[in-house]
């Protein structure tokens, strides 16, 4: 008999390496990390087909242009390499080791870490991913200054251009073009390294690599960044689609969200869709603990705003996503204000005065 309710385990990819090899146990123990800026904004293509057109994205004063090479824009699957690199570097930082932008590693260890196969085609796909990561140029005003200066957008604008990976080296056995890959070395960009040094990273669930569809990965990233360890987070469907960077109709995306709600297989969060308001609600499963959230111990992260405050914020900043503004406000303030609700509304009013409608 076929069960009426799909098994979430069947919806996820199989765990290809449930018992990691002995020689990579130190790698498997590294906590899975991702960069906050790339989780919140669509830096990566969601299609496996090469995308060679320049793409521009703008949201709440932040903007970025993604300029691909002739081999196509780096994809969300190529990003696995950077997630691995960030995880390894953060692991070393937490162990008190010195780190820099260069990382040498075994591609086999990486493939196991990201739940890939370890056949010949998987190694060749790894090399192709390096080429796309090196070829993709990011132009953006989303800064990761190493000095940590809290300059609100609107007062100054700092535009950066960088490659996701600045250089890469692959060593093959016997030096042959089709020889077995022995090791690889990459140098990440200063922009990414600054995020690591400032610990602008979040822990991801290991089942992230078991999500089958690129859009599911992207929705999880947004939920992880915006909801964090909060009980819930609500976002409009149209706004969520924009933030994913997906090239699909709102009708198609609505179907995607309904499937996520129906099958309930997203790691860390359940998904609820409000038909009346066309809103998506992420509900924490309680698997994300506050110690995993950057700056979670700060009072600014545990402030609770009144429900009426969001209505007043919408009036203060017409057209803006007040939930996104709330996150920006929390990141900007350094201590809990005496009147959080009034302070947040004032922040929204200033944003509207400086930036106008989005």
Segments the model singles out, each with a brief description of its role:
Residues 317:
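Short, surface-exposed alpha-helical recognition segments that flank or form part
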């Amino acid at each position: 008999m076929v069960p009426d309710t799909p098994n979430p385990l069947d919806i996820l990819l199989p765990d290809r390496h449930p018992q990691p090899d002995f020689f990579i146990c130190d790698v498997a123990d590294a906590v899975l990390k991702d960069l906050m800026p790339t989780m919140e904004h669509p830096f990566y293509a969601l299609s496996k087909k090469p995308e060679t057109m320049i793409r521009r994205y703008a949201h709440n004063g932040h903007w970025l242009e993604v300029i691909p090479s002739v081999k196509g824009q780096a994809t969300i699957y190529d990003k696995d390499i950077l997630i691995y690199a960030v995880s390894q570097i953060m692991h070393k930082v937490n162990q008190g080791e010195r780190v820099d932008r260069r990382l040498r590693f075994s591609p086999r260890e990486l493939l196991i870490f990201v739940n890939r196969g370890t056949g010949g085609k998987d190694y060749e796909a790894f090399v192709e991913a390096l080429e796309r990561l090196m070829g993709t140029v990011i132009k953006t005003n989303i800064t990761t200054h190493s000095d940590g200066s809290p300059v609100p957008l609107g007062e100054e604008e700092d535009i950066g251009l960088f490659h996701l990976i600045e250089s890469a080296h692959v060593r093959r056995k016997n030096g042959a073009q089709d020889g077995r890959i022995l090791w690889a070395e990459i140098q990440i960009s200063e922009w990414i390294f600054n995020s690591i040094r400032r610990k602008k990273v979040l822990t991801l669930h290991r089942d992230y690599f078991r999500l089958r569809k690129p859009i599911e990965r992207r929705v999880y990233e947004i939920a992880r960044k915006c909801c964090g360890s909060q009980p819930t987070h609500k976002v409009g469907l149209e706004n969520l689609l924009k933030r994913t960077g997906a090239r699909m109709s709102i009708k198609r995306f609505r179907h995607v969200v309904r499937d996520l709600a129906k099958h309930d297989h997203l790691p860390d969060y359940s998904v609820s869709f409000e038909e009346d308001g066309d809103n998506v609600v992420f509900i924490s499963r309680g698997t994300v603990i506050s110690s995993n959230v950057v700056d979670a111990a700060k009072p600014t992260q545990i402030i609770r705003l009144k429900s009426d405050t969001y209505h007043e914020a919408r009036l203060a900043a017409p057209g803006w996503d007040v939930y996104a503004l709330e996150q920006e406000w929390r990141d900007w303030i350094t201590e809990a204000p005496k009147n959080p609700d009034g302070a947040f509304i004032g922040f929204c009013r200033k944003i509207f005065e400086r930036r106008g409608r989005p």
